[in-house]
Amino acid sequence: MNLKKKYGNYELHPQMKITGYENEIWDEKKEIIEELKRAVQEKQKEKKTCILSFDLYPGVRKEEIMELANALQPDRIFDIEDCAKDEETLLREFNDYITDDRVFGIMCHKTIDTWFESEKLETMKKAIETERAEEKDTNGGLIVIVGTATELLAEADVLVYCDLTRWEVQLRYRSGMPNWHSTNYNDPILTKYKRGFFIEWRLADRYKKERYEKFTYLLDTETENAPVLTTGNAFRGALQQLAGQPFRMEPYFDPGVWGGQWMKENFGLDASKENFAWSFDGVPEENSLNLEIGGKVLKVPAQDLVFYAPHELLGERVHGRFGAEFPIRFDLLDTMGGQNLSLQVHPLTEYIYEKFGMPYTQDESYYLLDADEDEETYVYLGLKEGVDKKEMGRELCAAEKGEELFPAEKYVNKIPVKKHDHVLIPAGTVHCSGKNTMVLEISATPYIFTFKLWDWGRLGMDGLPRPIHLDHGMKSIQWNRDTKWVYDNIVGQTRTLEKTENCEVERTGLHSREFIDTIRYTLSGPHTVSMDDTVHVMNLVEGRSARIESMDGSFAPFTVHYAETAIVPAAVGTYRIVPEEGEMIKMLVASVG
C-alpha cells in the first residue's frame, strides 16, 4: 500500500464564531448556579413561587442535573420520571417498533406523553399546584422539576433545556448507560441504538422542536461534569446566524473491522488505535456544532439548526419536499491498508416505507477521494450478466450458515476505480467498496438501512458475526442491474458543463432514480455559484484550502481545508469559491436536484 500524507490541515474541532451574545454564556458551575438564581429571583418579583424546570434530552446524566437543582435550594424538587410507565409496560407498548431484529425497528410516530402514566401525571400536577399556592416567606418560593418532558407537568417560569448530541448518547451506551427509564445496562450496543434511533430520539425530537422559543436557557451537557449554559436568546440567535453563512460541524471517527490508516495519517488521529473506518463530518442528525460565544464554546446537536431554521437552511424547495429533515449525508470510508466493506444493498422507496416507516430511501454514491496507486483498486457494483437468482440466493444462504465462502466475483462486477472517479449507487444495486480506497460517501439520510449480504466470513469488532439480512436483501436487489446496465448508467457518467482557462464545471452524479446532484468545480481562480433554492454540502477533494466568500459581505470569508465537509445554507443564495493563490483545487458540491 502506498499511503501518501497530504496537507495535514484538517480541523478536528471547528468552532463557529457567534457575535452579539458575549455576556450570555457561563461555563463554571458556580457561575451557572448564580445565573439561574438571578433568573429565579427576577421571576419571584412577579409571583411568589417560581417554577424552574431542567428538561432533559434522553441520555443526559440526571445525577449531574440534580446537583445543580439542589444547589438552587428549592422548596421542593419533582422528578417527572416518577410518573413514567414501568419498564415492562414500556417494552410491551413499544414492542411493535422495537421488533426482534438485531438492527432494524420501525419508526415510531407516537408522542412523548405515551411514556407516562396519565393518572400519575395528574397527581403530580396537583402536588405542584398545591406547593405553588402555599404561602412562602418574603423571598418567595422555588419549585424545581427535573426529567424528560417536564412541560407535561407545568409550564416553567424558567425553562432550562439540557441538550445532548446523538453521538455522545451512543458513546454513553457503549460505556454501559441503559436506554431511557430502563435497566438494560448490559444489552448489546445494537439493541440500545435501535431503541434510541427508532423510538427515543423520535419522540424526544418531536417534543423539543415545538419548544425552542420557550427555552429560557440551553444547557450543554456533552462533557461529564462540565456543563455550559447560555441564554435561550443567545442559542436561538446563534442558530439564526449559522442559517445565513457557511459552517462546519465537529466530525467524529470510529474504527471498524475493515478500517484503514488514511485518516489516522492525514487527520492526525489517535495513533494507538488499530484503525479508523468511518468519519462522519456531514451528518447533522448525529454531528455537533461548536458555537464560540465570548471565548467560550457551547456544543449543541446540529439537528437543532435543522429543526429551528429549516426554511433558511434547506430552502423552500427542499423543505417543501423533505420537511425539517436534512436530506444529504457526507461521510468517509477508509479502507487504505484495510479490507473490503460488506457486500450490501439498500431497499427501494416502497420497501423502506412499507417495512420501516421511512418516507424515502438511501440512494448513494462513492467518490474516490484517494486510492492506492501501486495496485488495482476497485468497487463491487451490480450483477454480472446472466446471474441465476436462485443459485446466488442458495450460495448466500450457505455462506451465512458458515457452510462455504460466498464467491462474490462469480456474481458481482469488480469495477476498477482510481482517484476522483465517482460511481453512482441507486437503491437496489448490489455494491461494496474495495480495500485500499478512501471513499467520500454521498447519500440520502436514511443511513441505517443497509442490508448486508456477505461479510467475507469475518467477525465484527465485538467478536460476533455482523448482522446479515438476506431476506430483506434478496427482496431489494434489482436483478436487471447487470454489467451493461452498470456501465451505461452509473459508472463513468461525468459530463462537462462549462470549461474556461481557470475553471471546469462537471456534473459527476445524478442518476434518474436519485435526488442528490453532484457538481465538481476544478478551479485555479474565483468562481461564482448560484444555489437554486437548495442547501449545498461540499467537500474539498483536492487542494490545500479554499475560501467561500459572500457576494454582498453578509458573512466573513469561510475557509474549507482538504477533505473537510462544509454546509452552505440555501439562504446564502449565491457565493464565490476562491482557491489559494497559485493553486488548483477540486470542490465537490452536492445539492437536491
Regions found by a protein language model. Give the residues of each.
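Transition-metal
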Residues: E35-A39, Y212-K390, D455-T496, N502-E504, ...
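NTP-dependent small-molecule kinase module
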Residues: N2-E46, E64-Q73, S175-P178, G196-Q261
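ATP-dependent NMP and nucleoside kinases share a basic, alpha-helical "lid"
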Residues: I128-S182
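Ligand-binding loop in jelly-roll beta-barrel domains
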Residues: E325, T335-N340, P347-T349, D372-D374, ...
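ATP-dependent small-molecule kinase phosphotransfer cores
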Residues: N2-D27, E31, D75-G141
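Short acidic-glycine-tyrosine-enriched beta hairpin
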Residues: Y411-L424, E549-V572
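Double-stranded beta-helix
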Residues: Y380-P407, I442-R481, E581-G593
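Loop-centered beta-sheet repeat module
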Residues: G402-W456
